[in-house]
Amino acid sequence: MNKRKNIYFLLLLALSLANIVAQYISGSSIQSRLFNSDALYLPTLFADILSNNGQINEWFLTPAPYFFPDYPMFLLAYLAGPTPYSQIIAFALIQTALTFFAIWLIARVTINVNSFITASTALVILIWLALSAREPFALILNSAHHYGAFLSSILLLALWIKFNNEGQIQRKIIFLFLIAIIAYATALSDNFFLLQFVAPLIATQAFISMAERDFAFKNKIPLIILAICSLLGSISYKWVVENQTRYPTNIGIDKLSSNLKDIYELLQSATIGNPLFGFIFLLYVGIVLYSLTKIIRGEKESAKLYWLAIFSFLSLCATLGAVSLVTNLSIESRYLIPALSWPVIVVLIFLSYRLRDRFFYLAIAISLLTLASMSCSSHHSIISNGINKQYYPEEISCIDNALEKENLHNGIAQYWDAKYFQNFSRLNLNIAQHSDNLGEIHWITSKKYFKQAYDFAIISENAAPPDKISSEALTRINGSPKFVETCGRKLVFMYGKDKMRVRKIVAVGDSYTWKACELPTRIGEKTADCGIKKKDGTQSGYLTFGPYDQLHTGQYTFEIAYSSAASKGKTAGDWDVVLALPKEAKVLNNGLITGTEGATEKIVGIFALDSGQDLEKIEIRTLARPNVDLTVICLRIDRVQ
């Protein structure tokens, strides 16, 4: 009988997975979430390394590099699918299937009743929530969005419970070794793991120890080993990752009220916006309170179930508490994955244990209702959009045709377009990420994509600064493009093979002139002819600085055109040429700015960059002295060697 029931739920599970595929290939709203630039991190990385001879040490990885479990899962997806389009859906199915396995395992080690039915029902609900395009539930389909750390947490929790209830010493050692390895790999991959798993596990064990009056040190050794391995994993990031992008997390109460408001809105959207999940969440709160009283009273029956409820609640509290105190990051739904996913798992495991055989009828009713809802949405999406076995929008086709005609392959685009076009083009394109002022964006990309010269630029007409690449900046450096192709909302500026520069000065003989009003200022204001003059003659400070352009090793000359009403020979200010280094500027040359009696004159100087200073940012500063008139007109830099 149980085998037949499991077959029913296996069928329901398969139909739920089929709905994921149906909505994906019919272009539903989940597709846009899977195709944004952040979500295309692993497809781009794996294609570069496995197909284009790329090296991982050339990459600027995500701040949480997601080595485990995301990399092994995506490797399977990469081997299973010939294109990024098929690899993305393959990954979604693999991650969803592993979530089922993890839930099944934790149900088996806690209650060992209806484990398959419980895991199937939980996953059907989670898939339904995901396909309703509600975050963070939709992230079960995404790679590299913190879901992998949550998946590891479920698996590790099941192994931890199994370890604590294992009688054989050899098996306990094997389980502890496996736990330590997974904890190390996950902490190396995502610091969020420490918050959602390690901290609440320590707190749960401490609470249980106090409730049971168990203060023996030897019983704490496995927990200490797990904590040490997790911390070592987190610390190892600085030795493992070549180009580090992990940023510090600032904690304080400065944004507490706004953070709490954002968290409240996310919770309200998840619960009030979805009555079924809202009801599950209310049941979850009741289960946590019930479990808390049972543990305090020292009841041993169902202890593992109560322990699971307390752990999940402490994980929820740790997540929400820490996120509410962060001052340098915005509140994103992906930070609430454990807080909103654990209630579904815990409630179904608890109901399965309490209802026993009757749980089958509740589970099949819930599964059929949610499956019917998913199937209706999938049918509507297929009727509206059709089925696309390949993803090749007209906009990308238009761009490909234009580039293929001119035999162009190396180009630039804004951050949100670069990986998208590179992945879904039928051409072997190399597209580097650049900002509006043509600066390189070293964020989730490879160093090898950036070139001294390119062939084309893709400009999004509907993008806003600082994302939209400036056509004016391109034409000032390179002149008018050879061809311009309009493809939907994109403009393709085609200059020809290696005919387009983004750096103003690259080769010997290159020069560039900045009007003073294009440079930053502290005490100046713009003049009618785009110069910069002092707002207040009594002030002193930087009249102009910048331009922060990266220059290659070589020798350069510069000219600062300026005027001052001060008499000749009188000092009106100071100038210097510096490397804009992260901690402090390094002065390469400096001198005085003298009066010109109102005439326009030039300061001419030289500077050189050695091999250790290649591509450092250069800044040429003018510092006005008090009670002296000074106007900067323009700045010119020439590469002479």
Describe the residue ranges of each PLM region:
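Hydrophobic/aromatic-rich transmembrane helices and adjacent perimembrane loops
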Residues: 144-152, 195, 275-286, 304-356
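Extracytoplasmic loop-helix module adjacent to an early transmembrane segment
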Residues: 12-56, 74-79
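Transmembrane-helix motifs of polytopic, lipid-linked glycan transferases
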Residues: 13, 90-117, 155-158
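Short periplasmic/luminal acceptor-recognition loop of GT-C membrane glycosyltransferases, typified by
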Residues: 405-439, 565
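Membrane-interface micro-motifs in multi-pass membrane enzymes
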Residues: 67, 113-164, 331-343, 415-416
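Hydrophobic, aromatic-rich transmembrane alpha-helices
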Residues: 202-213, 277-302
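Short hydrophobic/aromatic helix or loop-helix immediately within or flanking a transmembrane segment
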Residues: 38-48, 60-83, 258-268
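Signature aromatic-anchored transmembrane alpha helix within multi-pass, membrane-resident enzymes
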Residues: 5-16, 173-179, 224-228, 283, ...
